[in-house]
Amino acid sequence: MTRGLVFFVSTACGILADQLSKFIITANLATGTSIPESGFFQIVHVHNTGAAFSIFQGHIEWLIAASVLGVILAMTAFFIRKKLPFLDTRPGLIALGVILAGTVGNLIDRVRLGYVTDFIRVGDFPTFNIADSCLTVGVIGLLLLYIVSSHVSGDTSENV
């Protein structure tokens, strides 16, 4: 599989997993209800008009603009990946692909519904969804790849 295909397949799989999971939750669980009703791990159906940790509540236009910018940045990174050796690898392109998937997954909700469907609650952590997980895992993956590639290439500069 070519590296470009790796990027697009990881993006498509992430978007599909996000949108399918939200469809299943919306079709089977009333807003505000959870399974189980209490406990450390719950599946709960909530609408979030904000971003992570519910910041920017009610500012959908800013969140849509930020998401569009995120899509542009991810696509730009894909097209200039040859200049970023840590990114021009299968793991780098998978990480970038799931970042794009998370951004697009939540952007679809915001444009279509005016909010994001969240449904995973773990302990006291704010409720989140598959798109949020894609973003988090992708960003952490890219950071780790960057750090490892910096050490491997012998870059010891403090200007990171």
Curated annotation (Swiss-Prot):
Q: What class of enzyme is it?
A: hydrolase
UniProt cross-references to NCBIfam families, sorted A to Z: lspA, PRK14784.1
- Where found in the cell? Cell membrane
Single GO MF descriptor: aspartic-type endopeptidase activity
Question: Where, by residue number, is the active site?
Answer: 118, 132
Please state the pathway this protein functions in, per its UniProt record. Protein modification; lipoprotein biosynthesis (signal peptide cleavage)
State its role: This protein specifically catalyzes the removal of signal peptides from prolipoproteins.
Q: In its keyword annotation, does this UniProt entry include Transmembrane? A: yes
Q: Say where the protein is mainly found.
A: membrane
Q: What is its EC number?
A: 3.4.23.36
Give the species this sequence originates from: Dehalococcoides mccartyi (strain ATCC BAA-2100 / JCM 16839 / KCTC 5957 / BAV1)
Q: What GO biological process terms does the UniProt entry carry, in alphabetical order? A: proteolysis
This protein is called Lipoprotein signal peptidase
